[in-house]
Regions:
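C-terminal accessory helical subdomains adjacent to catalytic cores in phosphodiester-
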Residues: 1-2, 16-32, 44-60, 65-165
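A short, flexible N-terminal coil/short beta segment enriched in small residues
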Residues: 1-12
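Conserved helicase motor
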Residues: 35-39
Length: 165
């Protein structure tokens, strides 16, 4: 069984998912996120850290697929396993399978809208963009509730299938 050495997330909502998955996997690693971490910075940091990881360690990143030309990077560099009707993907980095991405398509808000029927309009989406990390995670737990936990369990089970713990 491979262990996870680092977990990175692109935004607060992605961080909430990352923390819940890490807990489910029994990981004792802190999820790293700063307000400056967009998708490209998360990927760049993960690639840099990969060079210094032990052979049995993995990095998990929680990112958005995005729209338009920026999707190409994901398409070219990750082997994708689709979940939730192609709205969520678990991607294994083609150049180094120790980097695994959980990818929301096209973004976390779009994924939640399609799967839960929430966060579809701009006012609701703002709830995921303001306040502290704790407030955003509490918002997700309260509004999405049981569905949030099911999504976390599905992601966790998929990661276990590819032997990540």
């Amino acid at each position: 069984m491979s262990r996870v050495g680092l977990v990175l997330a692109e935004c607060y909502a992605n961080t909430c998912f990352a923390e819940a998955v890490a807990r489910n996997l029994g990981l004792e690693v802190k999820v790293h996120h700063t307000y400056k971490m967009g998708r490209e910075k998360v990927i760049k940091k993960a690639e840099k850290v990969l060079r210094n990881l032990r052979g049995d360690e993995h990095i998990l990143i929680f990112i958005d697929y995005e729209i338009g030309p920026s999707r190409k990077y994901i398409d070219v560099n990750f082997e994708l396993q689709a979940m939730y009707g192609d709205k969520l993907h678990v991607g294994v980095f083609k150049r180094d399978e120790r980097l695994i991405a959980i990818i929301f398509d096209p973004n976390i808000e779009g994924f939640l809208c399609k799967v839960t029927g929430r966060y579809c309009d701009e006012d609701e989406r703002k709830m995921l963009k303001r306040g502290s990390l704790e407030e955003v995670c509490r918002e997700l737990q309260e509004v999405v509730g049981v569905e949030f936990n099911k999504i976390i369990n599905d992601i966790t089970n998929t990661l276990r299938e590819i032997h990540v713990e």
